[in-house]
């Protein structure tokens, strides 16, 4: 792909992702309203569809006033660090054969690295705010990411072993014409989904911004577009986790009749709907229960799944 085509595709992808994140906020609020038997946004545009545009314009016009005594460098850097790595992560996602900005040999590891950077944004924002509630939220985020990133990587290694590659396109190609890896790796898929919820900081793994005891957690002192960038990063993280889950376990772009990018988009949308459904259905656990589950239950299961898969892969190769 020439440099001009890469630049053009990158621009189109950027605009599509920003639009998808905005539409997702509207879809989430409408779906939550339906699940909770109440009205969602229904004033701006048909079915409230333009509510996300109105919210964006409102945040653009709001003042962004740092608190007194804030570390301005950390305070300003944190929102950008929450959003931009998520955009970079989509640079290695293969939406269809040859429809990828950069099909890296270590594409899966690159996406994991981008997801892990979000915890730096949360800790920097908490530290820069000089706020006790924000600092507690940042510390929770750091401990949670350390616990859940450990088995996030282990849970996807089964797919890497079966495909024999970290490249996104190779993993999808290994599932074409055969069984999707969600059927061969059901435990790995379940563990990866749970870890993905934690990586995206979604309920029930959103204790770093728990409103009941931390006001707004690490975002307590943010407003205006800085606040919006944190939310943009969160929704892009959901889409990135859904895209990675689709690639690893749902065959990527594979599907009958419809074009590959359409199948990929439908699968990502379905996974994103499950994220919203879980937000409406599940309570928030205690912090000690959350961390204990990661270290005592999920991590041993991920190791067991990896060992069994490695044994099967070696047996097939022999």
UniProtKB/Swiss-Prot annotation:
Keywords: Cell inner membrane, Cell membrane, Membrane, NAD, Quinone, Translocase, Transmembrane, Transmembrane helix, Ubiquinone. The chain crosses the membrane at residues 4-24, 77-97, 106-126, 146-166, 179-199, 214-234, 238-258, 262-282, 293-313. It is a multi-pass membrane protein. One of its GO terms (molecular function) is NADH dehydrogenase activity. Its main location: membrane. One of its GO terms (cellular component) is plasma membrane. Its EC number is 7.1.1.-. The keyword Cell membrane applies. GO terms for biological process: aerobic respiration. Pfam families: NADHdh (PF00146). It is found in: Cell inner membrane. It catalyses: a quinone + NADH + 5 H(+)(in) = a quinol + NAD(+) + 4 H(+)(out). Belongs to the complex I subunit 1 family. NDH-1 shuttles electrons from NADH, via FMN and iron-sulfur (Fe-S) centers, to quinones in the respiratory chain. The immediate electron acceptor for the enzyme in this species is believed to be ubiquinone. Couples the redox reaction to proton translocation (for every two electrons transferred, four hydrogen ions are translocated across the cytoplasmic membrane), and thus conserves the redox energy in a proton gradient. This subunit may bind ubiquinone. NDH-1 is composed of 14 different subunits. Subunits NuoA, H, J, K, L, M, N constitute the membrane sector of the complex. This is NADH-quinone oxidoreductase subunit H 2. The gene is nuoH2.
């Amino acid at each position: 792909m020439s440099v001009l085509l890469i630049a053009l595709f990158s621009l189109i992808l950027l605009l599509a992702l920003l639009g998808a994140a905005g539409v997702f906020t509207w879809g989430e609020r409408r779906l939550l309203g339906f699940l909770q038997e109440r009205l969602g946004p229904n004033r701006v545009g048909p079915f409230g569809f333009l509510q996300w545009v109105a919210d964006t314009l409102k945040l653009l016009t709001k003042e962004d006033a740092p608190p007194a005594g804030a570390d301005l460098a950390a305070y300003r850097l944190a929102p950008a660090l929450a959003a931009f790595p998520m955009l970079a992560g989509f640079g290695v996602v293969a939406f269809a054969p040859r429809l990828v900005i950069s099909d890296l040999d270590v594409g899966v590891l690159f996406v994991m690295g981008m997801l892990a950077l979000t915890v730096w944004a949360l800790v920097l924002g908490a530290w820069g705010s000089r706020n006790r509630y924000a600092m507690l939220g940042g510390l929770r985020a750091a401990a949670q990411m350390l616990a859940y990133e450990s088995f996030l990587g282990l849970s996807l290694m089964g797919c890497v072993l079966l495909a024999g590659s970290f490249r996104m396109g190779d993993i999808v190609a290994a599932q074409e014409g055969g069984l999707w890896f969600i059927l061969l790796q059901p435990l790995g898929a379940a563990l990866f989904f749970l870890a993905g919820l934690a990586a995206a900081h979604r309920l029930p793994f959103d204790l770093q911004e728990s409103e009941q005891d931390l006001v707004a957690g690490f975002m307590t002192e943010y407003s205006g577009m800085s606040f919006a960038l944190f939310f943009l990063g969160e929704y892009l993280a959901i889409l990135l986790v859904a895209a990675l889950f689709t690639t690893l376990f749902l065959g990527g772009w594979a599907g009958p009749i419809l074009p590959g990018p359409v199948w990929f988009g439908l699968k990502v949308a379905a996974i994103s709907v499950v994220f919203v459904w879980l937000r409406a259905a599940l309570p928030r656990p205690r912090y000690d229960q959350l961390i204990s589950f990661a270290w005592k239950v999920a991590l041993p299961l991920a190791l067991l799944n990896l060992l069994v898969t490695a044994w099967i892969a070696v047996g097939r190769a022999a």
